């Protein structure tokens, strides 16, 4: 095993703590709080998926379809989290009329992107006796592109 799993393993207890504290504490019951709750739950799911990517690397030579599904699910998590965070920023920053347009736009981008991620190819690179491992291919590049566009939308909101 590489050291790539150390950070997610260390982050899981903190993520659990944040989820438990948020759920147990009383807070304002508004839409922004509900989105935040989804963000912290998605974060925990993302940590689990990141650990599963290491498992995917271990089983890739015997079960490439299962491993690819794990990797692509992680990419979809990245798009989903970034899309939801983008919507959260718009929800707290933009007037009501613009919110409807941005909600539809970000929603469509996220949904279509998830479909494309599963369609596009992905490759796994494992080197140096499992010390270096990463994914590459059109699916990964597409995910980077979509997340960059969503972050660009967030930056545009600031101005």
Stretches found by the model and what they are:
Residues 5-27, 31-64, 70-88, 105-123:
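Hydrophobic alpha-helical transmembrane segments of multi-pass membrane proteins
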Residues 1-11, 113-158:
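Extracellular-loop-to-transmembrane junctions of the mid-late helices
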Residues 98-105:
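Membrane-interfacial entry segments at the cytosolic side of transmembrane helices
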Residues 16-22, 84-90, 144-159:
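Alpha-helical transmembrane segments in multipass membrane proteins, preferentially the mid-helix core
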Residues 26, 90-97:
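Membrane-interfacial segments
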């Amino acid at each position: 095993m590489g050291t790539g799993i150390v950070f997610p393993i260390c982050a899981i207890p903190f993520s659990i703590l944040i989820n438990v504290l948020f759920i147990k504490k009383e807070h304002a019951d508004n839409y922004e709080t509900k989105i935040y709750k989804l963000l912290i739950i998605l974060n925990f799911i993302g940590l689990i998926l990141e650990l599963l990517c290491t498992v995917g690397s271990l089983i890739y030579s015997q079960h490439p379809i299962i491993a690819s599904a794990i990797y692509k699910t992680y990419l979809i998590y990245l798009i989903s989290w970034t899309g939801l965070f983008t919507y959260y920023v718009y929800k707290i920053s933009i007037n009501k009329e613009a919110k409807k347009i941005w909600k539809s736009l970000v929603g469509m981008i996220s949904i279509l992107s998830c479909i494309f991620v599963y369609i596009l190819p992905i490759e796994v690179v494992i080197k140096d006796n499992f010390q270096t491992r990463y994914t590459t291919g059109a699916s990964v590049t597409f995910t980077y592109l979509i997340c960059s566009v969503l972050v660009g939308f967030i930056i545009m909101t600031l101005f």
